[in-house]
Amino acid sequence: MIKPLINLTGGLAAALLVASTHAVPLKQEDLSVAEVLRDRALESSDAYSLVESLTVEVGPRRAGTKGDERAVAWAQEKMKSLGFDRVYTEQIDVMRWARGHAHAEVVAPFPQPLVVSSLGYGAATPEGGITAEIIEFDDVEALLKAPARKVKGKIAFINKRMERARTGEGYGPAVQGRSKGMRAAAEKGAAALLLRSVGTDSDRFAHTGMMSLDGVENPVPALALSAPDANLLEAMLKRGKPVEVKLNVHNERLADGPSFNVIGEVVGREKPEEVVLIGAHLDSWDEGTGALDDGAGVAIVMETARLIAELPQRPRRTLRVVLFGAEEIGLVGAKQYVEAHASDLDKIVMVSESDFGAGKIWRFDTRIPEGKFAIADQMMQLLAPLGIERGNNKSSGGPDSSVFVARGVPAMGLYQDGTDYFDYHHTPNDTLDKVKPENLRQNVAAWVVMSFLATEMEETFGRVPAEQ
């Protein structure tokens, strides 16, 4: 009990008193402490200071690069300074790649330059580049269905627009072209792939990102076009004349190398072996500074742990913050973490991740057994005043967290407003000025409520069905 922290007023105090008269899994004093933590978070700018530090002092940090090395060192130093009880790293193995110059231009019928970005781990063109005719497809499914004879030797252009949504639900359909397009183009004998950027903006920035490389024997160059340049190609093609594009791309695959998951713990006072795991990913793409993806998430979970570590006593269970490495190239850090700790996953009480930018949180989802909904209902008493509504019980907890959920670990998700997230996602425009300090404060307030109460609840969630 931490009664000196408790300062309740009016309606909330009454609500907590009513809750305490029923058989509920969270004690009134724990809810009271969570309220104080929430209100402290709303008054603090420390999360913004963290993301400012990361973007200014480290900057881009693609897995396996010098920036990644600096980020790992930065994270360890910050965790120690924030009062974590244990700070350590676990090595992971990552593919490495060097991005070189990428140039694209229309050479006929209307010569003009195009703004492009190589997709992650994309191949280079032959010396001197390639020039070929464009063939357009509405989506990757159309490319997959096309006869190889129509595609061979041409540059396949996937012209799929992404729909804007608060939930980001337009990303799934649109990203199929990025993940599957290069493989499809290579199998059809295309000279290269051009992809309308997977984004919702109309800025002249291209959106990079990872693509599937598995089983591709002869990869072809693959580049994202900015939305205005995709519109330009579309307009040229409508004029009924063949459109020829020249590409000159200099990328290089490097030998595999190490990266790291960075882990910090606030060790539990009663049940240190039981773990509430909250995370974000430390790596970013290399053309912006990764402020939204995922610098904000890194700051949110680190600040959450700092607030809990400053309490007069440690939480009942261990709070573990994992800053996953190499998320952007395929959830590598999370996958290797789960494999390395497979025998201990039953000790993880709950997992959650912040990896959707820095918008305000508007919804609280779970993936817990139905018999445990009372815990989430009690958490909602303190989340609702932040403008957060109760969602569904289908949460993955976040991209990295989904790897844990697939093994039966319960999850919770605090979902941010993603209306404009994909305007900046994976672009040079993902920079600190897009992060609003007031939104970060609201995020941390929600995270500290959820995380603290998960460490203090009387009972655990048990397991959820593992996914095959």
Regions found by a protein language model. Give the residues of each.
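Metal-dependent peptidase/peptidase-like ectodomains
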Residues: P111-P113, A132, V220-L225, A230-N231, ...
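N-terminal capping segment at the start of a domain
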Residues: P25-T65, F205-L213, D283, S354-G359, ...
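Noncatalytic luminal/extracellular "stalk/propeptide" segments of secretory-pathway proteins
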Residues: V24-V36, E52, V56-I155, K160-T167
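Extracellular/luminal Protease-associated
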Residues: T65, V115-P221, T289, R390
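Soluble metallo-hydrolase cores and metallopeptidase-like ectodomains found primarily
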Residues: L31-V33, A108-F110, V115-A148, M211-A291, ...
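His/Asp/Glu-rich mid-to-C-terminal helical/loop segments that flank catalytic regions of hydrolases
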Residues: R306, E310, F422-Q468
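Short helix-loop-beta-strand segments that form the rim/entrance of peptidase-like active sites
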Residues: S49, L307-V332
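N-terminal signal peptide c-region/cleavage motif recognized by signal peptidases
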Residues: V18-S20
